[in-house]
């Protein structure tokens, strides 16, 4: 849908350009369309991705997020993939409590590195001098704000807004078709989860985050907004199958350092999705193992991106979450400490929640293996 710019009334969209990417190829040069809908035919068995720009006499807008779809050969069903990872932010920061507020402050990358837009080429390393009173003495001793330089030559991956394609590739591999949408369309009601037997909510590193210095505008990027909670609750009540993954699925509702927890949010997590928060910063090594449970037999080990790199955003603070119902179980644990990394629930509906983002798994083989296990659980109640 077009969005009006209140600061510039002439910036209205007149036409749109739809760009298409087939499989692992690049985007084409786009198709100019006159209205905000476009119909095309998809090849079978391959992920097709789309992005849209708006155009008028003044030029072309920035592109939209990238949404994808895929039609499987003899599909077992269709999965709705919801892209709920919109966050862009600076790292976590702190200012010491008074009277030390004039003495200590800085960024805490290990707590939350933040999320760059697409990629970051300016980051050089973690901050290491937090004392405000330390002056610049030399370029090698630059005082307050001084940082390590071990990432000076490296590109750091951020939010690329294209994760439905990664999830979709694993869904196709498991024999299911998929479509995708933004979380806003679900919240507004223009897309109904109830039309699909399976849903996959991508939360990435979504969590409530301040804008700028904070205190002027409300926090943004909440994992489960009130409209999303309502949509998910209705979907589960009708017997749906929901997969959710993200770094802060528990912390954002129980222990976000920027806001007080809301009991209604926690009730939604425990009574609808059937998990509860245990701890943030649950693991440092980025390794997960499947364990024996009613979910099914163990199907191997997994690893996710736990260090800064150019290929995928970093997961520095995964969540440990635990079952909140007798009918729920832990089916994955962090290898280094056995904290619960994934919870599955089987009742009148089924849920599967991970405390780390699915798309950050390092290899396609790992993603394919885990997605097949989850969809098999949804279909049969356990892995076969």
Regions found by a protein language model. Give the residues of each.
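Hydrophobic/tyrosine-rich beta-strand signature of extracellular beta-sandwich/beta-rich modules
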Residues: 48-52
């Amino acid at each position: 849908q077009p969005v009006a710019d209140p600061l510039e009334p002439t910036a209205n969209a007149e036409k749109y350009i739809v760009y298409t990417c087939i499989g692992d190829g690049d985007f084409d040069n786009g198709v100019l369309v006159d209205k905000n809908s476009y119909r095309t035919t998809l090849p079978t068995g391959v992920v097709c991705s789309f992005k849209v720009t708006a155009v008028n006499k003044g030029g072309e807008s920035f592109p939209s997020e990238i949404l994808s779809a895929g039609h499987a050969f003899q599909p077992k069903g269709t999965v709705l993939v919801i892209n709920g990872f919109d966050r862009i932010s600076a790292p976590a920061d702190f200012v010491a409590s008074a009277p030390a507020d004039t003495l200590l402050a800085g960024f805490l990358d290990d707590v939350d590195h933040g999320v760059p837009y697409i990629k970051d080429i300016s980051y050089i390393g973690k901050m290491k001098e937090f004392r405000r009173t330390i002056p610049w003495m030399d370029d090698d001793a630059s005082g307050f704000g001084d940082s390590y330089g071990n990432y000076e030559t490296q590109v750091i991956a951020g939010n690329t807004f294209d994760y439905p394609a990664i999830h979709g590739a694993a869904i196709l591999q498991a024999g299911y078709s998929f479509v995708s949408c933004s979380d806003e369309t679900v919240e507004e009601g223009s897309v109904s989860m109830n039309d699909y037997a399976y849903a996959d909510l991508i939360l990435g590193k979504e969590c409530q985050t301040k804008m700028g210095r904070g205190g002027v505008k409300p926090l943004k990027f909440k994992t489960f907004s009130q409209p999303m909670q309502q949509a998910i609750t209705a979907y589960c009540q009708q017997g749906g199958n929901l997969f959710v993954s993200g770094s802060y699925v528990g912390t954002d509702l129980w222990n976000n350092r920027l806001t007080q927890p809301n009991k209604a949010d926690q009730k939604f997590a425990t009574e609808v999705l059937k998990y509860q928060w245990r701890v943030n910063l649950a693991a440092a090594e980025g390794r997960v193992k499947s364990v024996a449970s009613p979910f099914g037999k163990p199907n191997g080990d997994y690893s996710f991106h736990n260090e800064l790199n150019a290929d995928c955003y970093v997961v520095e603070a995964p969540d440990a979450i635990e079952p909140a119902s007798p009918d729920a179980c832990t089916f994955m644990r962090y290898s280094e400490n056995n904290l619960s990394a994934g919870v599955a629930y089987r009742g009148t509906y089924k849920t599967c929640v991970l405390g780390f983002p699915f798309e950050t798994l390092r290899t396609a083989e790992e993603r394919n293996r885990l997605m097949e296990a989850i969809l098999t659980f949804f279909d049969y109640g356990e892995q076969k």
